[in-house]
Amino acid sequence: MAVHFFHTSDWHLGQFFYNHSRQYKHEQFLTWLLEQIKQKQPNALLIAGDIFDVINPASAAQKQLYQFLADAHALAPHMQTLMIAGNHDSGYRIEQVEPLLEKYNAKTVGVIRWNEDKSLDIEHLLQPIYDVDQNIIAWCLSLPFLRSAEITGFNEH
């Protein structure tokens, strides 16, 4: 059985380039990507970091992402979306909305987590990819950008 992934990264939603908004270009890209999803019906869409251009993105940039996820789910309800935080993203912000994104078959990994015995919580990072019959057909290790505080443990709550 073939597994079909779309792998993207570095969307930088909300970016201004020399004081000019790139929102229109982002809209064009997302429209194109939705058309590809509609035509090819991949098993998973992987968004590998730098979803937003800044750690605190404008509400318009967040709305653009969430509208895209809703539209993509409508076109390919079986498709899973896996998003990981990049160095421009807030890992906590990306994970914060995950309960809402589950409706759209989307999963986020923004930060690494540690078990009580100080070992890496691999379960948080390892994501199964399913076919339309909900059989596991692949695994994805979703490793976000690691900030030094996350590695040393100084970032614990």
Where are these regions (language model features)?
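A structural signal for isolated positions on well-ordered beta-strands in alpha/beta enzyme cores
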Residues: 46, 80-82, 139-141
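Short helix-terminating capping/connector loops at secondary-structure junctions
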Residues: 76-79, 135
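Metal-dependent catalytic neighborhoods of phosphoester/phosphodiester hydrolases
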Residues: 18, 51-69, 85-104, 108-110, ...
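Short, solvent-exposed loop/turn segments at secondary-structure junctions
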Residues: 13, 89, 145-148
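Conserved catalytic scaffold of divalent metal-dependent phosphoesterases
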Residues: 104-157
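N-terminal active-site segment of His-dependent metallophosphoesterases
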Residues: 1-70, 77-78
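Short secondary-structure boundary/capping segments
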Residues: 22-23, 98-100, 156
